[in-house]
A protein has these predicted regions:
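Glycine-rich FAD pyrophosphate-binding loop
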Residues: 29-53
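Short beta-strand to alpha-helix junction loop
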Residues: 78-88, 105-125, 171-177
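Phosphate-coordination loops involved in phosphoryl transfer and adenosine-cofactor binding
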Residues: 9-11, 104, 161
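Glycine-rich active-site loop/strand segments that organize a redox cofactor
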Residues: 55-103
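Predominantly flavin-linked oxidoreductase catalytic cores and closely associated redox partners
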Residues: 118, 122-198
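N-terminal amphipathic/basic-hydrophobic helices that include classical n-h-c signal peptides
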Residues: 1-7
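Conserved dinucleotide-binding and phosphotransfer motif residues
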Residues: 31-33, 97, 130, 189
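N-terminal Rossmann-like FAD-binding beta1-loop-alpha1 element of flavoenzymes
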Residues: 10-37
């Protein structure tokens, strides 16, 4: 996904099979990592599939400044991330996965099919092609030894890892599985959680 791809030989566990989790798993696998993706829902991308009224607004076809202008608070925080993977990169990524896109009013980008399922299905196909192991399990805790995260404890098993990516989402729309457990696990690992403001 990035122009400068490093080769890594690490065992990585990604917690969460939404858009962020799938993208993190793909990025790590494309760089040579052995990736396990933990997701408790029957399907990956459950919230992704209902975004944009089921159409999935993939990105906005604009430059970095245009993206940042639409972020209500502290958008500059995302500048380096958008500099590494911007709107054009996102559009190219999905078109290479076989999802034709269209730009509509307000520079909003959607699949030509108007179906969010096409986005999640394309991500799932790529995960499978890269041999990402998808396990239906709910992470309950991070395994921490000597102050370092070294794995994940799930309801059905334990998963060792050299790195763990928390991509569980927030607490919006709990019917999709967003319970905030990632925030709890991050806090238990010593991270500071800043409350979201409306």
């Amino acid at each position: 996904m990035y122009s400068a791809v490093r080769t890594m030989n690490k065992k990585i566990v990604v917690i969460g099979g939404g858009a962020a989790g799938m993208m993190a798993a793909l990025s790590a696998a494309e760089q040579g990592a052995q990736v396990t993706l933990l997701e408790p829902n029957e399907r990956l991308g459950k919230k992704l599939n209902i975004t944009g009224k089921g159409r999935c607004n993939v990105t906005n076809n604009t430059d970095i400044e245009g993206l940042l202008a639409n972020i209500p608070r502290n958008g500059k925080f995302l500048y380096s991330a958008f500099n590494r993977f911007n709107s054009a990169d996102a559009m190219n990524f999905f078109e290479k996965l076989g999802v034709p896109l269209k730009t509509e009013r307000g520079n909003r980008v959607f699949p030509v099919s108007d179906s969010a399922f096409d986005i999640s299905a394309a991500l799932e196909r790529r995960l499978k092609a890269l041999k990402v192991q998808v396990i239906r399990d709910r992470a309950s805790a991070l395994k921490i030894e000597d102050g370092a995260v070294c794995g994940v404890v799930g309801e059905r098993g334990r998963y060792s890892a050299e790195a763990v990516v928390l991509a569980t989402g927030g607490v919006s729309y709990p019917a999709t599985g967003s319970t905030g457990e990632g925030h709890r696990m991050a806090a238990e690992a010593g991270h500071t959680i800043t409350p979201l403001q409306g």
